[in-house]
């Protein structure tokens, strides 16, 4: 045995352990930095006529094998890529929201010419509900993203009659992305109020929903175009961030009640997420059947089938 190498190996192991410990402390401190919103609440949404066709419902990050269970829970939309075999696999009684977008400032799933071909192919397909053009675009960091969304939304409007364009927003600048500026039909708002730890705490920051709705109001996004994004994920088993926990059943009821106050008859309602995402979402709604996790599936089934 080469004893001369032992101190060097021990030092390397120690350095590795310290690095791992530092990363875990960073994640803990990052989560602990979250301050609950204590500003003004958003005004209640109008309780006017229900959207034509009622509220459509989708749980994101699904596979074809999930469709029977999703349909049983009352979801009528699935997210798929603009692929002929995937679109053809959308079950009867459901439609697809086609993911063709980008995340924040990243490249788009499809270049513009490829996007045009996809719209030409699926723009009149009855299995297609609409087009998911961007996930959390950040015009503060990449101002050009607004122009790209605008030309894609305009192309959908011209060549996909009856189908919708959709983007999902977070708490980044919204004003460059309003319907008046980019022509998008529907806007997901994704405040995730159960934040600050990957382990469940007594309270979620329900006011975060009001904060983001007020941001959208101020920017000029009409409530009638808002699609609530419901938090159906945590991060206790994710490999990346540890900032969010899966809401308890009572906390989830509180989330639903707040959204019902602010957007009582939305055209679209989104559950994020059904499927696990290694870095960002674990556990998710697919896990939330009771036992070790809250039974959020039963709550969503009752909600989806009653509205």
Where are the model-predicted features located?
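Hydrophobic single-pass membrane-insertion segments
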Residues: 26-34
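N-terminal Sec-pathway targeting helices
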Residues: 2-16
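Intrinsically disordered, low-complexity regions enriched in serine, threonine, proline
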Residues: 5, 25-27, 47
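Glycan-processing catalytic domains of CAZymes
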Residues: 9, 35-307
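Hydrophobic membrane-insertion alpha-helices, especially the h-region
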Residues: 13-25
């Amino acid at each position: 045995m080469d004893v001369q190498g032992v101190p060097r190996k021990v030092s390397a192991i120690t350095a590795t352990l310290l690095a791992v410990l530092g990363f875990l402390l960073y994640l803990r401190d990052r989560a602990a930095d979250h301050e609950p919103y204590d500003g003004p609440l958003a005004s209640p949404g109008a309780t006017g006529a229900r959207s034509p066709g009622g509220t459509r419902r989708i749980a994101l990050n699904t596979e074809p094998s999930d469709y029977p269970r999703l349909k049983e829970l009352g979801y009528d939309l699935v997210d798929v890529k603009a692929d002929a075999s995937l679109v053809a696999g959308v079950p009867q009684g459901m439609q697809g929201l086609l993911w063709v977008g980008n995340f924040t400032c990243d490249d788009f799933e499809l270049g513009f010419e490829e996007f045009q071909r996809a719209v030409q192919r699926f723009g009149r397909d009855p299995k297609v509900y609409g087009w998911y053009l961007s996930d959390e675009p950040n015009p503060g960091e990449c101002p050009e993203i607004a122009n790209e969304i605008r030309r894609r939304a305009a192309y959908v409007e011209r060549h996909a009659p009856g189908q919708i364009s959709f983007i999902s927003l977070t708490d980044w600048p919204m004003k460059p992305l309003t319907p008046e500026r980019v022509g998008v039909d529907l806007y997901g708002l994704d405040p995730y109020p159960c934040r600050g730890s990957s382990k469940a705490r007594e309270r979620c920051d329900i006011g975060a929903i009001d904060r983001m709705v007020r941001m959208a109001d101020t920017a000029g996004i009409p409530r009638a175009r808002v699609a609530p994004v419901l938090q159906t994920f945590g991060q206790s088993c994710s490999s990346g961030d540890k900032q969010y926990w899966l809401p308890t059943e009572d906390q989830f009821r509180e989330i639903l009640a707040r959204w019902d106050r602010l957007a009582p008859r939305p055209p679209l309602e989104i559950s994020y997420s059904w499927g696990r995402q290694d870095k960002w979402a674990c556990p998710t709604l697919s896990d939330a059947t009771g036992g070790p996790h809250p039974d959020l599936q039963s709550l969503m089934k009752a909600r989806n089938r009653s509205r």
